[in-house]
Amino acid sequence: MASGILVNVKEEVTCPICLELLTEPLSLPCGHSFCQACITANHKESMLYKEEERSCPVCRISYQPENIQPNRHVANIVEKLREVKLSPEEGQKVDHCARHGEKLLLFCQEDSKVICWLCERSQEHRGHHTFLMEEVAQEYHVKLQTALEMLRQKQQEAEKLEADTREEKASWKIQIDYDKTNVSADFEQLREILDWEESNELQNLEKEEEDILKSLTKSETEMVQQTQYMRELISDLEHRLQGSMMELLQGVDGIIKRIENMTLKKPKTFHKNQRRVFRAPDLKGMLDMFRELTDVRRYWVDVTLAPNNISHAVIAEDKRQVSYQNPQIMYQAPGSLFGSLTNFNYYTGVRGSQSITSGKLTNFNYCTGVLGSQSITSGKHYWEVDVSKKSAWILGVCAGFQPDATYNIEQNENYQPKYGYWVIGLQEGDKYSVFQDGSSHTPFAPFIVPLSVIICPDRVGVFVDYEACTVSFFNITNHGFLIYKFSQCSFSKPVFPYLNPRKCTVPMTLCSPSS
């Protein structure tokens, strides 16, 4: 029993690297102890392989060299153990063959087993390659050391694979969480769009119901009156036929002619096959439009209007609103500011002026177009204009003019890109158009192209990409539907936001980014 205890103690104070009793033992923070020479050699190997962290050869827990401590207690145990000599019986159990009792001196290569000389001659090991343990111990020590290094390298690869897998797992989680957020946002937008479309469609159906039922109710009343008239006429005829001869003949020709000339009034009908057919909205297209609008809104700038004493337009104190003011010019005597007015014109272009020096004012133009204070010379810019309840307006961008400059009317009245205007407009309440360059036959008149706008916008978004040379207009009321886009604009000069309320007293309002 004492020998068993000694063997166990010996195992506890044996170096895991060299498998010998510890020499100058050093302990790591994890609790494992090694010979000073062995752990030092391990450090050098770590530096050779450029490992960032040093780890325990047994449990692979990282440690810092300064945390290694000499273990004097273990050193004392090793010294005492070296002084203890096992009894012959105990030594026999450790170093002698359990079968033959002979000392174990040989190594069988085929069976990878330590044997005695009698085992070598037995049938079990006959013909095997056997060597003295001293002859092969160093060779196998080198092989085991090589295997250990290979295993450590594979362990490093395994740890890297583990770290890569953990990193990929985290990356996937982040990506999927991001996709979840986007999906939720997209479906929330779709729900909003669907709610709006449903409400709009129901409103259309309610209006259709109101109009049709109102008309049919009117027709029903007329049919009731017509039927009642027929009843009264039939009753009159029956009375004549049943009465005296005098009653029969009294005014008979007039009654007969009235009956012969009578035509039944037919009710107004509505054909169901001619009704507007409901079609489900293109959700993907609408969502793409909404995403494009969300993207350009990232470049929203706070635009204000430049003061304008020339243009016949009223700018609010907050410089966000412009409205048309109906001109009221009173006649004054010659020599005063205003004399008689002839050939009076209302012009709704960019600001212009004409000096008034005599008592007669001819061909006077009132202008209602105004510019934004901020010039655009690079980058991307976006703003929105509230045009609700207006029956006419023009908006977009204007290039080449300073907000406080006085221009020539004849030069600036043409809304053409070649003159520095990239604008769209509304007139007569429902006619939308874009102003393009005139033809070679009419170079001084813009070519006005009608625009198909299904839902009239209460708010219009304007997006300028200076580097891409584009100006885009969005129908905010219709989920950001693209109204029109100018491409290949020649922005050779700074451009300014342009608003023109035209001859409509309802104001145009620049919306703040927070609205």
UniProtKB/Swiss-Prot annotation:
Pfam families: SPRY, zf-B_box, zf-RING_UBOX. Residues 283-515 form the B30.2/SPRY domain. Degraded in a proteasome-independent fashion in the absence of viral infection but in a proteasome-dependent fashion following exposure to restriction sensitive virus. Autoubiquitinated in a RING finger- and UBE2D2-dependent manner. Monoubiquitinated by TRIM21. Deubiquitinated by Yersinia YopJ. Ubiquitination may not lead to proteasomal degradation. The modification Phosphoserine is found at S87. It catalyses: S-ubiquitinyl-[E2 ubiquitin-conjugating enzyme]-L-cysteine + [acceptor protein]-L-lysine = [E2 ubiquitin-conjugating enzyme]-L-cysteine + N(6)-ubiquitinyl-[acceptor protein]-L-lysine. Zn(2+) binds at C97, H100, C119, H125. It is an enzyme of class 2 (transferase). A zinc finger (RING-type) spans 15-60. The keyword Zinc-finger applies. GO terms for biological process: activation of innate immune response; autophagy; defense response to virus; innate immune response; positive regulation of canonical NF-kappaB signal transduction; positive regulation of MAPK cascade; positive regulation of NF-kappaB transcription factor activity; protein K63-linked ubiquitination. It is found in: Cytoplasm; Nucleus. The modification N-acetylalanine is found at A2. PROSITE patterns: B302_SPRY, ZF_BBOX, ZF_RING_1, ZF_RING_2. The B box-type zinc finger domain and the coiled-coil domain contribute to the higher and low order multimerization respectively which is essential for restriction activity. The coiled coil domain is important for higher order multimerization by promoting the initial dimerization. The B30.2/SPRY domain acts as a capsid recognition domain. Polymorphisms in this domain explain the observed species-specific differences among orthologs. Capsid-specific restriction factor that prevents infection from non-host-adapted retroviruses. Blocks viral replication early in the life cycle, after viral entry but before reverse transcription. In addition to acting as a capsid-specific restriction factor, also acts as a pattern recognition receptor that activates innate immune signaling in response to the retroviral capsid lattice. Belongs to the TRIM/RBCC family. Can form homodimers and homotrimers. In addition to lower-order dimerization, also exhibits a higher-order multimerization and both low- and high-order multimerizations are essential for its restriction activity. Interacts with BTBD1 and BTBD2. Interacts with PSMC4, PSMC5, PSMD7 and HSPA8/HSC70. Interacts (via B30.2/SPRY domain) with HSPA1A/B. Interacts with PSMC2, MAP3K7/TAK1, TAB2 and TAB3. Interacts with SQSTM1. Interacts with TRIM6 and TRIM34. Interacts with ULK1 (phosphorylated form), GABARAP, GABARAPL1, GABARAPL2, MAP1LC3A, MAP1LC3C and BECN1. This is Tripartite motif-containing protein 5. It comes from Chlorocebus tantalus.
